[in-house]
Amino acid sequence: VLELTMAAVSAADEGATAGMLMADAPSEAGAVLRVGRDKSVCRLATPDDWLFVSRVHLEFLCGPDGGWQVTWLRGSQADPSSEVRMTVGEYVQPIAYGGTVPLPRGGSGEIVVQDRTAPRSVNVGFYHEG
């Protein structure tokens, strides 16, 4: 099982957990969870006017071995208006635009989509059961 929690954080309400969304999916090959502005395909939807987030920004996909990975999907712009990084414990790893990284089995962490032009972010916490 992969469990996700998402909070949209702006400078005005930093530290607030109001509006936190949650989603989970079984660790079965082909299972998908998406994060973005498009509510029709994203289980975790961000505010419509947060244009630094793509319609479908992050895709969590379960592979045939039950391991999960996250991909920062390329949007309609050549240069993204956000930065994405994954934190696991003390380790911080930037995720490249269009890049994919595996999630640690039996581990937890956070993926942050940071607006490049304003002090706001989308924080997605994850827990991947081993």
Task: Show the residue positions of the predicted features.
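Forkhead-associated
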Residues: 57-114
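Short coil-to-beta strand junction motifs in C2/discoidin
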Residues: 52-55
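Intrinsically disordered, low-complexity acidic Ser/Thr-rich regulatory segments
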Residues: 1-50, 61, 100-130
